[in-house]
């Protein structure tokens, strides 16, 4: 069975079915911030070290496989679906995943509502951008909801999977407008936090996993999404998550684009707080400045264009032109790309090498 094809002109592999034999992943990032993303939006993110500075949680032996990632739920009427198919696994009218050089784009549709999601790590920035464009291809106005969702790792990926008697009491977040700040251990011993934000006013949010999923719930049908109503939960211990609720209305032919940012923010020790440390007001200056860099579709697309230019230049120094198309493709695109990913990761993180053993990257 064929699951996709190579698009040499765009340096992409195009996956045409979400039901691949195993998750087919791409690596986002070229310097310090990295994300792994599968063809169904599974994966995780980390800053420099996949063991000690992991932003989002991933369960390697989960059932079903690859069922934790960076997700967007679209709820229209009684239908709930995801641009990458997982985790709702609703049959889609159209689906494509384009794994490119440092970015992945998902194009899918359901009931004349089209979604295009592009995930990438901008050059020189410690963040992942998710640009989500929604288009109404019907002849009637569409009213629906979008729910974002990530599950935060408590930084140390090994400890996160083992030290439960402690972990269940340490998770901590705060919310300001459309920005969610994961600040576990920031007060005690860290000078960094994670940011998850969107460039639009939200109609609700959630930061507590059990509140979002519901009692005995699961991420294929979260209680918040099914009910179409966020709970505005604030995590205190247990499992912190990030979820934004956006109510969207599209006229026939209309499109809207939202830019989500997942970032690692580090403050100098002497600048951890605004005012007195006892007041507990984290310094959000760097986070707010980063959000402004990607607060429009135009800024996001400019960063994506810069990333593509970066890879085009990197791959331009050695080329082969032969009578064998497959050889040219391997040498000119994918072999070089694989070598750079291996160099950046130091073979430290994948879906099979967890990054927890030595967690070392370059």
What residue ranges belong to the model's regions?
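Anionic coordination/interaction segments
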Residues: 1-362
